[in-house]
């Protein structure tokens, strides 16, 4: 380091030290984001509202454009290091004043108006593109993705590769990508730009998720990166996170009365009460090494579980009342090797499961009363995941 720069560097560090507490004091956390603000000093001030019940972000902003070497927009950001995936369902409010109003997801080195960046940009007309500025102050460029209005977007960083994927609800994603060496830590999040200095536009972002991908040495079923329990409206696709945990939460069963979700975690089963969010342990007695193959009976009165028995940890099927039991009833024998439950018959008399028998995994049925097993498939390849139809005629 040259001595001639010493004073300037000291000044910068002092200013940074003084400004960091002030900046932290001014941060306005909103939902999963650290802050929201205008970038590029638009003539009209933007805003953002988080609806905690619906888990949606309503974002309003102005700005002449996000193009050439100057950007003006409203920005909800979070500082993220390394790889990430940001997903959102997007919707403009109203017809709009300019065809080139813009919404999307962006990653920037800085909060300056001419910062290097890459984004997933959806315009008010039929254009969607991955826009980028390769160096500070350079002209914006783009890689066009589509000529339709997507409802769902995903913006991914993998090293120096940025990938923009988009689709209309229910359709297949299309993708484009661009290599761009942004900083390892960037400001990433949601944006809106009206394309007009004297007009504000509004958009709603729902199903917003920030995902940090697993490490390259990730070992499935041995390493875990956390879990959300979500519910989804199957007509609209709108999702809500009910519960999050740093460990693995698996396979929620929705009770027929609509009151509970029953899920497994680290060998035990839990009740999640939908009305209150209260979580309680479901008593399964000594069956405390359960995997994620647990199933409610059609009437909702019984639950079947798959518990790993003994030192060999053989997955074995038990049944018990949905209210819990100290002594679940054993249905399959561990000396027949693994049995993974998948469905009750509608009359509650039989179970079907994936069974390890005769050196392969096939679909089996078992009579609960007699314990008699019947092979339904006999194939060398893995057969898995059988379910009864509600009328019990088909599997």
Regions found by a protein language model. Name each.
Residues 26-218:
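Extracellular glycan-recognition regions
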């Amino acid at each position: 380091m040259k001595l001639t720069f010493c004073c300037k560097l000291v000044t910068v560090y002092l200013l940074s030290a003084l400004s960091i507490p002030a900046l932290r004091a001014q941060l306005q956390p909103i939902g999963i984001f650290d802050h929201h603000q205008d970038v590029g000093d638009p003539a009209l001030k933007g805003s953002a509202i988080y609806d905690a019940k619906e888990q949606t972000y309503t974002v309003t902003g102005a700005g002449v454009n996000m193009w050439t070497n100057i950007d003006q927009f409203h920005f909800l950001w979070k500082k993220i290091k390394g790889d990430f995936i940001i997903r959102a369902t997007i919707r403009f409010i109203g017809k709009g004043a300019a065809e080139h109003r813009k919404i999307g997801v962006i990653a920037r080195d800085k909060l300056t108006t001419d910062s290097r960046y890459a984004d997933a940009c959806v315009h008010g007309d039929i254009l969607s593109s991955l826009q980028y500025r390769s160096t500070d102050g350079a002209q914006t460029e783009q890689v066009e993705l589509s000529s339709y209005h997507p409802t769902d977007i995903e913006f991914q960083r993998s090293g120096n590769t940025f990938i923009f994927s988009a689709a209309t609800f229910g359709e297949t994603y299309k993708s484009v990508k661009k290599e761009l060496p942004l900083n390892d830590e960037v400001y990433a999040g949601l944006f809106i730009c009206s394309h007009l200095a004297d007009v504000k536009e509004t958009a709603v972002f729902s199903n917003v998720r920030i995902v940090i991908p697993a490490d390259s040495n990730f070992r499935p079923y041995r390493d875990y990166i956390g879990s959300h329990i979500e519910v989804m409206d199957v007509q609209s696709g709108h999702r809500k996170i009910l519960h999050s945990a740093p460990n693995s939460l698996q396979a929620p069963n929705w009770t027929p009365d609509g009151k509970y979700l029953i899920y497994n975690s680290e060998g035990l089963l839990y009740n999640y009460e939908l009305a209150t969010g209260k979580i309680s342990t479901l008593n399964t007695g000594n069956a405390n090494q359960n995997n994620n193959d647990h199933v409610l009976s059609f009437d909702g009165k019984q639950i079947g579980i798959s518990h790993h028995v003994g030192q060999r940890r053989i997955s074995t099927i038990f049944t018990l009342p949905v209210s819990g039991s100290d002594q679940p009833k054993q249905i399959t024998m561990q000396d027949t090797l693994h049995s993974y439950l998948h469905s009750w018959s509608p009359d509650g008399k039989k179970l079907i499961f994936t069974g390890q028998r005769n050196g392969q995994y096939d679909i089996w049925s078992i009579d609960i009363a007699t314990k008699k097993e019947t092979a339904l498939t006999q194939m060398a390849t893995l057969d898995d995941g059988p379910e009864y139809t509600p009328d019990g005629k088909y599997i």
